[in-house]
Amino acid sequence: MTTLDLRKEAAPPPAFVSAAARFGVIEKPDLAFTPAVARETEHLYEKVKDFIPAFEWAAYAPYVHAINRLKKERNAVILAHNYQTPDIFHCVADIVGDSLQLARDATKVDAEIIIQCGVHFMAETSKLLNPEKTVLIPDAKAGCSLSESITGADVRLLRERYPGVPVVTYVNTSAGVKAETDICCTSSNVLAVVESLESDTVLCIPDEYLAMNVARQTNKKILTWKGHCEVHERFTAAELLAYKEANPGIEIVGHPECHPDVIAVCDFSGSTSGMINYVKDKRPQRVLLVTECSMASNIQAEVKGVDFVKPCNLCPHMKRITLPKILDSLLNMTEEVLVDPAIADRARLAVERMVNLKQ
């Protein structure tokens, strides 16, 4: 008797086809500052004229013009974090915001292509939430000190050490770390996320200062990890007190990635969007934003009459994103962001739990 094996052989995984192969490469356009380019970008220059001298705009405008034309041709949308420079934030971005805003808005875009003007974990988050879309980051080396402070293996060891304790992971982490966590958080919703969990003890990783600051707002026991943002950890309480002494009446608005001693000196603390809304609503006569200094420039045009004191701590990773690199990304469809399918579903679940959390 002959036995037939009717089981089908497993189909081989589909061959990877690069974004450049899928969408094609476009030849670099002429980047001359022509009268037509000047006219078509004039309204955008009005938004950044306080930060870019008129004689320098001739170098920016051709890139702005080309990017805005190409993103329509490519059916692409540009997402930019609040720490991007004003030329990107005001002149080419379609959606701007903090990490939570960008994560939520990434799920609503109709475009085929997402250009993520931020650091790599943000692009990964957009890819997790849009697995069928093409996500590009203009510079794949745009990293993050927080993201690099912890690995998925570290989280597994923490789970062994603290069995049954839920893990809340800051979005400033790799997909591999997110895959080992229960739910993600951002600086704008970390307290709501922690309070949503039934456990009296919560692991809040990897930002030690964010965890310490939320511990002051909850009755839960917060376990921490020693990760720090290289921008925010440089601020000190003594520095801010010196600013207060030198500028009577100044309001200090801080980010919760700063040390709790720094936050104690602040008049308000919140996510980058929370900080922006505070300044827009309160309209203080003079204000100091304790965060990456490009953000003050980005909102200065919208709050005329507010004097910004700028202790300039720049994020070297955010500053890797530039107009020439964005243009190159659109022309050559690089750098494409991919997430290992073995971890993507678990990482996506942690992000979706955060995005869907009612606040």
Swiss-Prot record:
Role, per record = Catalyzes the condensation of iminoaspartate with dihydroxyacetone phosphate to form quinolinate.
- The yes or no answer to whether the keyword Nucleus is present is no
Q: In which pathway does it act?
A: Cofactor biosynthesis; NAD(+) biosynthesis; quinolinate from iminoaspartate: step 1/1
Judging by the UniProt lineage, the source's domain of life is Bacteria
This protein is called what? Quinolinate synthase
- For the keyword Magnesium, the answer is no
Q: Name one Pfam family in it.
A: NadA
User: Which reaction equation describes what this protein catalyses?
Assistant: iminosuccinate + dihydroxyacetone phosphate = quinolinate + phosphate + 2 H2O + H(+)
What GO annotations for molecular function exist for this entry?
4 iron, 4 sulfur cluster binding; metal ion binding; quinolinate synthetase A activity
Query: What's a GO cellular component annotated to this UniProt protein?
Result: cytosol
Top-tier EC class: transferase
Q: What is its EC number?
A: 2.5.1.72
Name the keywords, alphabetized.
4Fe-4S, Cytoplasm, Iron, Iron-sulfur, Metal-binding, Pyridine nucleotide biosynthesis, Transferase
